[in-house]
Amino acid sequence: MSSIRVRQILADVMAGEEDGLPERLCRACAVAIPVTGVGLALMTPAGHGGSITTTDGAAAVMEDLQQTLGEGPCMDASRDGRPVLQSDLAVTGMSRWPSFTACALEAGIAAVFAFPLQVGAIRLGLLNLYRHTTGSLDRHQLAEALAFAEAATTMLLRLQDKRPSGQPLHPRLAEAVGSRREIHQATGMITVQAAVGLAEALLLLQAHAYSSERPLIDVAKDVVARRLRFAPEDDHHE
C-alpha cells in the first residue's frame, strides 16, 4: 500500500475540526472510489461496538442490520481479519447471510465491500462500502479502498490518543458504543411488542425514524423509555 497516498488522505481529512474527522474521511472515500455510500464502525473486544458515522441512510441501514443480526460481510471481515468483497449480494449473499441479504436487497443495497481496521491482531473497526448496483472494485478502486482503510485506522488511533484523561474511549467512539446498545435494546423490545423477528423490528424502527425525520438513536431512546410502542400488524402509536 502506498504510504504516500495514505499520508495524502490523512492530510486532506485532518484539515479541519477534530470532531468531523470520521465524516470527512467517509465522504472523501465515497468520492474517490466511487461508491454509493460509506460507513465507519467501531469494534470492541466483545464484538461490534457501533456505527461511528455513515454517509447516507442506506449505509446506516447496512450498518444497523449487521450489528443487530450479527451477520453480514462486515462481521466476517472483522472476524477473519481480511476484506470481504461481495460484488453481487443477490447471487452470493443468501447462502452466507440470509437475513442480512434479504433486508439489504430490500433497502436497495446490491454490493458490499468490507475492510477491517486493525493493528496486528487488535481489531479497531471497519470501513464498509456499498453500491446500489452490482459490480466488482477494479484494481485502482481496491487500492484506494485499502488506502482509506489504513488512513481510517490511523485516524481512530489518533482519536484515542486524544481522549480525555481517565476516559477509556474518545467521546466520538464512546457515543458509537452507547448508540449501539440503545438501538439493540429498542430492537429487542419491538420484537416483543410487534411480534416480529429482529430484522423486521429494526426495519420498523428505521422506517419510523425516516418518516418522522428524526435520528435513529432518538427514536430508539423513545422506545426504550416507553414513549413509543409498536403494535402487532400496525405501524406504531405513541
Language model: regions and residue ranges:
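Interdomain signal-transducing alpha-helical coiled-coil linkers
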Residues: 3-6, 15, 138-142, 157-170, ...
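Short beta-strand-to-loop transition segments that serve as allosteric relay/switch motifs
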Residues: 89, 126-135, 140
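Intrinsically disordered, low-complexity terminal regulatory regions
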Residues: 1-69, 221-238
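Allosteric cytosolic regulatory segments
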Residues: 142-153
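Regulatory sensory and allosteric helical modules in signal-transduction proteins
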Residues: 43, 59-96, 102-110
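Signal-transducing coiled-coil/dimerization helices and immediately adjacent hinge/linker segments
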Residues: 161-238
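Short hydrophobic beta-strand micro-motif common in sensory/regulatory domains
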Residues: 111-118
